[in-house]
Amino acid sequence: LTAILAPAAWAAEGTDEAQAEAKTTLTAADAAQMQQADAAVTALTGSEEYEQMSREQRRAAALDELDGLARKGLVRRSSIRTDEENGIVSFTYSCGVLGGILFTPADELEEMTLDAGENGLRPPRGLAEASPSAEMPLTEDVREAAAARQNARQSDENALPDTIGRAAIYYAFDNTVNSSRFPYYSYMQGFWEGMGIRTTMNTRVTLADLRRMDRYDLCILSAHGAYYTYSYGALWKRTRTEPIILLTEESTFYKDIVYSFELLSHRVIKMNGLYCATADFFRNAYRAGQLSSTIVYSETCEFLGVTGSVDESMAEALLAGGARAVLGYVNNVYTVYSRSMLWDTVNHLGMGMTIGGAVTHAKDTYGENDIIWYTEQGGRRPHAAAAYLVLYGDPNARLNVPANYSVAQRADEITVDDIFGEVLDRAA
């Protein structure tokens, strides 16, 4: 009897899953059930107790929570999967939408190594107390270029345009409150504005915002990333792993309905009750090639997967959307290395360099990968796999800097501190 009934039960579950996967819209009941599950997940992951737990305790707590949700019929028990390497428990909601719980928070995956923490890492020299201007000093050529730009503005002859490009920083590392990261990005925004790169800072990044990247010449994705593995298939289970970008946009009943098609098609998933974008999200958003004037620079961890399993789907999706060039990291990247590379690259784009030349300059300055940078700072116990920046697309892409822009002829009378003194003082 058992031998006959068990396959029948499995078949029934598989039929339910097949029907759910055939959906193209979420019902109000589906969204309400997801919100019930999300409330339980966020109550766990947002608790002080969860924050104080060890990695193993978090994993156990996540599995226990999902077990309870499976008993209530809110998630599919057969979909629950633990990814030890990437610190995620993935699952599927009963309606077919993908979700996950991070038991290794993103900040730990890309830890700056400023404290021992669970990783037992020693800090590089003095970086714990570094101000933005100290951590990210101006190279001499950038100082001269900034001064030259101001001189050119003051002269009618060979005057430069007020704007050499439009940039957007999509800042989704945190909500900026008591943030150790945000002051650096505010500093960069102010400096780039002075160079003539009109820079928008978006600190409440939504999926809708990521559909409007074609408005800018340079888009900077400053967010956490992860390598997400999930199970799919009604009767024959298979697994798939792909990079995702974690946003700070909270899931709501209304947004679940609005995003229903993208959630059900797995272009968007939920992690800790927050929305995340996949490569297919970008592929669909820019299927008409709207990014033809845009360079995309991603700081997210594992944007291109990991060593031994490089995944170019994010870069390919953006290039298919017309992006002139796409930059991103393989593996988890140290925070300071990542933003230092960004700082140097964009500074040199503002000087008129091509994106290929600017990236080469940044690597020459800070190292080919983050372990080289880490050891040069005096670090003694680097993480296991070096993160390195890869450029796809046209290495000759550049901002609208005039060909007659001459640093040497225009840097005699003014210093960068005169131009950006207020920015430097505020960031110090």
For the regions a protein language model found, what residue spans apply to each?
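Structural alpha-beta junctions
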Residues: 72, 189-201, 318-329, 353
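Long terminal accessory regions outside catalytic cores
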Residues: 12-108, 116-119
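Catalytic cores of nucleophile-dependent amide-cleaving enzymes
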Residues: 245-339
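Sec-dependent N-terminal signal peptides of Gram-positive bacterial secreted proteins and lipoproteins
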Residues: 1-10
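Structured catalytic cores of large enzymes
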Residues: 69-168, 305
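Surface-exposed patches in mature extracellular/periplasmic domains of secreted proteins
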Residues: 77-79, 200-208, 329-331, 355-358
